[in-house]
Amino acid sequence: MKKTAIAIAVALAGFATVAQAAPKDNTWYTGAKLGWSQYHDTGFIPNNGPTHENQLGAGAFGGYQVNPYVGFEMGYDWLGRMPYKGDNINGAYKAQGVQLTAKLGYPITDDLDIYTRLGGMVWRADTKANVPGGASFKDHDTGVSPVFAGGVEYAITPEIATRLEYQWTNNIGDANTIGTRPDNGLLSLGVSYRFGQGEAAPVVAPAPAPEVQTKHFTLKSDVLFNFNKATLKPEGQAALDQLYSQLSNLDPKDGSVVVLGYTDRIGSDAYNQGLSERRAQSVVDYLISKGIPADKISARGMGESNPVTGNTCDNVKQRAALIDCLAPDRRVEIEVKGIKDVVTQPQA
């Protein structure tokens, strides 16, 4: 019968629905089980009646999961009441116990484990019988026996799991005290509830690095100033008003604005350097008056450096024509350097 019970357990395990069983590390669980309890090698005093070795077994257990492979369980088992009848003796035997085992598991899939439990059971066995002549007999015994179990465990949800298990307990009782020393096999179906299995905190992607922006604006000096002057014209103020609205839209979180003034090559280097500085400062002063913080903006005169006309005006000799040809060199460049946060949309 023992071999038959083991074979049935293995066969049923083969049909277990594939699904993650081990609880999270360092968490507790509790459960209950119900199944077929079968006594073996009962060894009663010779009797000519039946011994009902197959009974209903049940139990409750609690455990602590150390990691996906190792846990510890403590539980109570009711192994069933076994009646026996005959001309020589009529009575019943029952056994129950508290067990402590180490549970060793291995994940087959995310939701399915196979496992074994190894440990011991502190049991109590009771017998009560009527013997020929009308006398009665009643006694009990206690002891410790090894426990071996194997099974599969399937996680229905992160909190709830079910298990199919076959458990073997050896030598429950003392034949000299209660008349028998049987072994017990318990094939059971159990369900457990795991604590602390809530969803893991979502992984938050690191914030994207701030985006460094640099914007360049170029304004013609002939629009901003009269020739050879550094005072803004009304048309120049209007142009700077439009520029200021663009700077406001850029809205750097932190950064700076640099105003670069350029002249053409007419006149001495020193004069052109001074004129470019005064023009750049005029633009800075106006933008500060519009609202740009004074500590975020600066002026720099570049004189006649970096001409954009190149040598296109080299053959122009008439002064008026040369002034007109060199107009692109007379300019104000505004460079805005800032850091603008990158806004990311949350994922649905």
Curated annotation (Swiss-Prot):
Source organism of the structure: Shigella flexneri
Alphabetized SUPFAM superfamilies for the sequence: OMPA-like, OmpA-like
Member of which family? Answer: Belongs to the outer membrane OOP (TC 1.B.6) superfamily. OmpA family.
* Site positions for Part of salt bridge gating mechanism: 73, 163
List membrane-spanning regions. Answer: 27-37, 55-66, 70-78, 96-107, 112-120, 146-155, 160-167, 186-194
What protein does this entry describe?
Outer membrane protein A
**Any one of the GO CC terms:** cell outer membrane
Q: Where in the cell is it found?
A: Extracellular vesicle; Cell outer membrane
Q: Where is the OmpA-like domain?
A: 212-340
Q: Sorted alphabetically, which NCBIfam families does this protein's record hold? A: PRK10808.1
Q: Which CDD domains match?
A: OmpA_C-like
**Annotated function:** With TolR probably plays a role in maintaining the position of the peptidoglycan cell wall in the periplasm. Acts as a porin with low permeability that allows slow penetration of small solutes; an internal gate slows down solute passage.
One Pfam family of this chain: OmpA
State one molecular function term (GO): porin activity
Binding partners and assembly: Monomer and homodimer. (Microbial infection) Upon infection with phage Sf6 associates with the mature bacteriophage capsid. Was originally suggested to be within the bacteriophage capsid. This has been disproven.
The record's region (3 X 2 AA tandem repeats of A-P) falls at 205-210
